Amino acid sequence: IDRDQLNEAFWLGVGSPGSVAPAPGTIYSPGAEWNKKWGVLDLKQANDLLDKVGLSKKDSDGYRLRADGKGRLRLEMVTVGGQFVPYTQIGEMVKQQWKKIGIDVDIKELERNLAFTRDNNNENQLITWANDGSEVLFLFPRHALPVDAAESHMGMAYARWYASRGASGKKPDDAEMLRAFDLFRE
């Protein structure tokens, strides 16, 4: 994602493009390098990562093909209309940016309650939402780690597993996520 382009277009250049990490200057900041990690546009790295996970084949329009051979890889990005941030327009710009790496995106604007109900039912592939509050990780952890079974916008099955201490949901198979869960619980 070209966060600088988004910043210029939607925040008139006054934002601070970066990653989901507590802001520098807060006691929770893991260090300035984390505010840019995975948040800087690098088309070569993006293409290399997509190729590495088995998405190296493309159709005649340059879009990546699914690894299972069932045609073009197409993602649905849910946006919430009528909010304080123009999520749908941001989604459209990201769609154009991802075209450069061969990712096809359908933008689907939904009413907020429906979008969040779909989130809770683990029915969204992607959803756009604000990242406000991530500078205080313990107040708004859901922006960085799926620990809130009611309001995480990512990994709801993982959030349910974490919140229920393994009684429901799905245990992540990623060791780093499990370690992050352990550290957060401490």
Residue ranges and their predicted role:
Residues 56-74:
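Short helix/loop segment immediately N-terminal to the Walker
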Residues 93-97, 103-104, 121-129:
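Alpha-to-beta junction loops
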Residues 127-141:
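Ligand-binding clamshell of periplasmic/extracellular solute-binding protein-like
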Residues 1, 14, 26, 79-83, ...:
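Short, flexible loop/turn elements at secondary-structure junctions
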Residues 2, 17-60, 81-89:
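Structural transition elements
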Residues 7-8, 12, 18-20, 39, ...:
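Extracytoplasmic/peripheral linker and loop segments enriched in polar/acidic and small residues
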Residues 72-82, 105-106:
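Short, well-ordered beta-strand elements
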